[in-house]
Amino acid sequence: MQSPVVRQVNVRSSSALLDRYRAVRAETLSLVEPLSPEDLMVQSCSEASPAKWHLAHTSWFFETFVLRDFVAGYQDFHPDFHWLFNSYYNSLGDMPAKSLRSSFSRPPLEDILRYRDYVDAAIARLLESQPDYPANAEAVRRIMMGLEHEQQHQELIATDIKHALFTNPLHPAYRDSSARPSAEGIAPPVEWLTFDAGLTQVGFTPDAANAELFSFDNETPRHTVYLAPFSIATRPVTCAEYLAFMDDGGYARPDLWLSEGWVMVREHGWHSPLYWQQDLATKSGWRIYTLTGWQPMDDLSETPVCHLSFFEADAFARWASRHTSGVRLPTEFEWEYAAGQLGTLLRGAPQRPELLTYPLPGDSVAVAATPANMLETGSLHPTRASARSGLQQIFGDVWEWTSSAYTGYPGYRPLPGALGEYNGKFMSSQMVLRGGSCVTPATHIRASYRNFFTPATRWQFSGLRLARDTA
């Protein structure tokens, strides 16, 4: 399969929006196709949810925030689904505890699939009744938000089922090994792209010609920040490089760790990234569990390391600074600025980060225009950087931890009503990640996109790219 290009979808008609709606909904069903009914019920850690619940909740979102508000006389599919499949919207009423989701053997899967069909038909009727696009701009905006929300849950389905299958003592594969990335070659040496100090704009603001482009409220408002001079690595840290940190006693040296991170190491016995195991059967070193089953370290050593917590990423950066002065994690604004400069480096002209199409085919200047490794590639795991020079893998492969705490931008205002709970109430004790991963849909990511997780989170495809101070 040809690798996808990261791009935003600029929807300009009701029919185009309906086509996009159907495509996104179909992709969700394709993700659960390899799973048995029993697989769909598993919830193996506190962060995860059963795939069956994801199927229902994504339909609940459209029913709750679109159909109930914009379809006169709309009848809910089931009177109990409104509270049963609510996730965390407290202003809409009570909901079951997240830890109980795996106990929902009823409603059965057939009812959940009928629920999806019911909601899909209602959305289609709504859009087909509005040939003059957009007849209701707020309804369109909420449908687009629902699609972005569903794409987030597509990634969660992949990460949740990976954890569930790994927890199973049989360690079954989600899909067969035909989609495994090639083990040939080595990652290119790290180079450093250097940027001068100055003021820059960050955040998302569409222009008049692209008013239909979507962003979450936490990407706004666009505002000015000052960046000190910095350099950023041309690729993420690889498994081999992280293994060197481990071999140097990285998990046994408290001087490398933040206090809370060291507590996690001691209390939870961290000694490697999640899904790494020493291969005792063959005594050949490490092996790594992937969605296509176990793979030897030799096959993945040159791919970006993933399933790291922020604490592990930060400890690695501190260790690396002993060898290269000034090395650290980038701030989220340094990352966004570097990502936004792809257009400048390729074409020699400024380009807005949030409207960036990456890669830009046909260009061959400073940045390697290799396609992004995202959900559509089917690799389901980070792949090796190409041998070409320049900034690589800025989108896809692994979410990249930054040193920035997740908080609101100056002038931030959450959305009105229950949708205001989507992002704003989580702006505490979380860190920002950027760039998307190998299971992020290509039409979902953009340079201004802010993901966020607590610093101990490991079950996501999270890795790191280094930055460093420059004089």
Predicted regions located by residue number:
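Disulfide-stabilized, aromatic/cysteine-rich ligand-recognition loop
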Residues: 1-49, 53-122, 126-132, 136-165, ...
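Functional-site microenvironments in short loops/helix caps that host divalent-cation chemistry
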Residues: 146, 150-152, 156, 160, ...
